[in-house]
């Protein structure tokens, strides 16, 4: 059995921290496990970078590429020490070698945490402040500062590690890193950042989840209340009480044609006609492509006949709900104000129910459930090694059995960072593609649609319409 304790040797070697009591074979297996995990992380990082490289023009994808680039370099650095120590069961690293590997590993670990936080902060700003300019939302205006701080902050933390002049970085047999004692260096330069980032990420994701839920509920309430749909849109102040107060509804198709046929010599657009106090310039405000005269509302609707037609045959966005209203006519005179108002509201309500925006918001609501996937992964990666260290420090020299197996899992999780993040991205992309194919109205087979989406992704166009 090998007892890894604190032993201060000559100046040419670094001290080894007391981790667990392992045999030669267990130590070799532990190093092999770290090498395999780091190698897989390298592959997944390259796949993630290649996957997003075609969309690198957007600032969000640039942040993701920066994150996986750091993970790629970090995985390479993590492989160096166990590869050098694999042939020697009890490897004593020269001080300059362990200091170099430990310094760059600490810098890359902190840089990884920084880019994780930047990605989540950028997404949170996009969700919480959607009314800002589309091209300059999130952290776009501060992108140069963000990239500069990604080097300044980690390098500063790495430099602070040298304040521990006795054991700056120690040989932990699977890596060269900060010593476990004195605890202030491990807590100040490692644990404190993990705890702060965990709390900040959970807070941001919770705010995003609550904001999305509130917007979806508000939209559902608005779309289901057909009788109050005009009040919600701020189109009219109250319902009409007389036939001459009925205003034409703002139908959602901007390609529709309007035809007016006056029944007498007096034009309904005459300057002598006084608009109703209940009417507003509906059509021009909602549809700027309509003629200017259509925004006036006649006051003598009983005397003037109106022939109102809408033709949706040339509209590319026609839905099933709009097919029932392709020929909508109002003849003069109106029999009752209730019939006129109810027909207007019913037509508009059916159009709103079949609005593709409603389906889009339902899809966003279902996707919002995945917001906590990233915090769960980060907490899993950060908490396990910390619990392992706490248990070992509480029971020194007695970590065996289940404690040893837990320590192996903690070491595995600590070296599997890129795999966890890449798998989360891959699952998310598959889910988004599945919902896109499921809700898409197409006569093509699933296989043809998958090939079409793959071609879009290869050209960097998939997701732009989202």
UniProtKB/Swiss-Prot annotation:
Q: Name one GO molecular function term.
A: G protein-coupled glucose receptor activity
Q: Where is the composition biased (Polar residues)?
A: 292-305
Q: What range does the record give for the signal peptide? A: none
Membrane topology (UniProt) = Multi-pass membrane protein
Q: Name one Pfam family in it.
A: Git3
Residue ranges under compositional bias (Low complexity)?
A: 262-285
Tell me where the transmembrane regions lie. Answer: 30-50, 65-85, 101-121, 144-164, 192-212, 372-392, 409-429
Its cellular-component GO annotations read:
plasma membrane
Q: Which InterPro entries match?
A: Glucose_rcpt_Git3_N
Q: Which parts of the sequence are annotated with region: Disordered?
A: 262-337
The keyword Transmembrane appears for this protein: yes
- Record localization: Membrane
UniProt superkingdom: Eukaryota
UniProt keyword list: G-protein coupled receptor, Membrane, Receptor, Transducer, Transmembrane, Transmembrane helix
Which intervals carry biased composition (Basic and acidic residues)?
308-327
Annotated GO biological processes are: adenylate cyclase-activating G protein-coupled receptor signaling pathway; adenylate cyclase-activating glucose-activated G protein-coupled receptor signaling pathway; negative regulation of induction of conjugation with cellular fusion
The protein's assembly and partners = Interacts with G protein alpha subunit gpa2; the interaction is direct and leads to activation of gpa2 upon glucose stimulation.
Similarity comment: Belongs to the G-protein coupled receptor GPR1/git3 family.
* Physiological role: G protein-coupled receptor (GPCR) that senses glucose and signals via the heterotrimeric G protein alpha subunit gpa2 to activate adenylate cyclase and PKA signaling, and suppress sexual development and gluconeogenesis.
Q: Mind telling me what this protein is named? A: Glucose receptor protein git3
